[in-house]
């Protein structure tokens, strides 16, 4: 059985299996995050730092100050001219997720990319 986490959103709690259901998490404001899931987008009042510590053991990776991705949902990795990467993920192909220079070395090591 896969581990479930609870997301507080708009007065209710949603139980979700991160590895199977969460595609990516983005945050533009420090106190809230958008969980892009296989069931739709869920907004929750959590910081990316808290989410990262919760989900990194479950196959998630911080790619940028504003993004955490489920590594198993990556479909395509594009090299950018400025030395960064751009990810395309399943379920949300229009959301192009950056891998910033700060995280790129660890990202490549994690995925065993040369």
Describe these PLM feature segments.
Residues 1-96:
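Conserved binding/recognition cores within well-folded domains
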Residues 106-114:
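C-terminal output/interaction extensions
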């Amino acid at each position: 059985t896969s581990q479930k986490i609870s997301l507080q959103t708009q007065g209710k709690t949603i139980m979700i299996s991160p590895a199977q259901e969460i595609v990516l998490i983005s945050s533009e404001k420090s106190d809230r995050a958008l969980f892009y899931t296989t069931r739709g987008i869920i907004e929750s009042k959590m910081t990316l730092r808290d989410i990262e510590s919760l989900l990194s053991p479950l196959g998630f990776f911080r790619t940028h100050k504003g993004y955490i991705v489920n590594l198993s949902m990556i479909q395509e990795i594009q090299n950018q001219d400025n030395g960064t990467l751009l990810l395309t993920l399943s379920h949300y192909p229009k959301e192009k997720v950056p891998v910033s220079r700060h995280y790129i070395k660890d990202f490549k090591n994690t995925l065993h990319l040369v």
